[in-house]
Amino acid sequence: VKSCVKCPTCAIMNGFGGAGAFSDGKYNLTNEFGGTLYEYIGKQKAMELMHYVDDINVACGGAGTKLYSTADSGFKRLCLQNNLHLLDASVRHLGTDINYKVLENLYAKLKDHVDFHFLTPVKALSITEDGAYEAETDKGVFTGHKCIISVGRSGSKWMESVCQSLDIPTKSNRVDIGVRVELPAEVFAPITDELYESKIVYKTEKYQD
């Protein structure tokens, strides 16, 4: 598609899979970066859930894809020798085509057991007197004793308003600012072939920042 086809909503950012449907299918299995789930449920439980999701991805079409890992990597020792710290992580790289197929297979497995309502804006979310959640939409009101909200970046402002209405405290996440430097693939091939993607930290000797 060379230009916008004027679809009712942007299918690249919304819908089943959201923005992730057309990503390169990279899944980081680590507590070192990418989120702070471990702060709420503990590091061990967080890792168990990440591996659980990884198992589902593999079972739904990701079999045969490579799981890269920093464990026992010679680059970790090389980093330490140069005052650098290689963050521990495993990375499952599905690739765009397989990632889309995994999501397609997931939808096929779920559609007979779950009611999907697309293009259904949630106007308000409240808690009833008996502790149930009530979601008001333009297609009616849905209630349930458990509610999972996963709106991504496109719904972050709406999510903030929901938290305010339910008196849920919020805080801003840290934003890492960096410089993107592109080099020929041959330069980084020894690293990317083994780790695919690595996070390397350098702390200044004087201020440790």
What are the functions of these language-model segments?
Residues 1-36, 68-209:
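Residues forming the flavin
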Residues 14, 39, 58:
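N-terminal entrance/gating region of PLP-dependent enzymes' catalytic architecture
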Residues 34-51:
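Short, surface-exposed, low-complexity cationic segments
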Residues 52-56:
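A general alpha-helix detector
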